[in-house]
Amino acid sequence: MILALFAAPLKVTAAEQNGESSDKQQNETTGQKTEETEETAPEMTPDLGLASPSVLLMEAQTGTVLYEKNASEQRSPASITKIMTLLLIFEELEKGTLQLTDEVTTSAHARSMGGSQVFLEEGEKQTVETMIKCIVVASGNDASVAMAEHIAGTESEFVSRMNQKAKELGMNDTKFEDCCGLTDSDGHYTTAADVAKMSRELIERFPQILNYSSIWMEEITHVTQKGSKPFTLTNTNKLIRGYEGCVGLKTGSTSKAKYCVSAVAYERTASKIE
């Protein structure tokens, strides 16, 4: 279980994990921390009485850690894993190898994903932009795998790229085994500190992600051989409506991970990542 907070000018985030579990879309809590070269909070961290076993609060622009609790403990991240998936997607968009209007075809493997999903059918096509919304708003495991395969050919190759990116970011206590966080394998883990690193990288390099992560509800259209029908995406991050200034980022939950969240919110003078 992880709680992570991110901060940046005019932005604040908060997250917490409890002892409950769920295989469906749920609120989640996650953590984040900065590299050794970044400014950190004083050694004496006050006890805030938080139930979450791992927590980190960061000011996003400077990377200053404002609060942390067991931020270096390895834990199962659940769907917070998708933050790295989104980071790689936006890097492809930046390079021009991917366009928001490109169509992505859902494979049988992507279609077979359980847990939180948007119920894509095998052979169904959706634009990259719609897939991004499905991932960050509804936490769609099927959409995550479809995008991974579209970019790298196979999910396993995409996961290799995720782990390479983690190394580049100094996420030394992180290892990914899938692109969506559905697995509860002991070999799939991260820390609040590492979640903070990848979350900060995503929102600082690609602030447009917040235009998607702040969506509360939006309708997409499934178009398959069965016909066309609407489907409503609802944000799994309830902080979007329950915490003033919250604009993201990603929740996650499995029976092992419990509830996790990496949250981003705006403050009067700073934005924070939790």
Language-model features and meaning:
Residues 1-13:
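Sec-dependent N-terminal signal peptides of Gram-positive bacterial secreted proteins and lipoproteins
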Residues 6-7, 62, 111, 270:
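Generic "edge-of-domain/loop-turn" microfeature
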Residues 15-193, 203-204:
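Active-site-adjacent loops and short helices of periplasmic peptidoglycan-processing enzymes
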Residues 48-50, 54, 154-274:
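Penicillin-recognizing serine hydrolase domain
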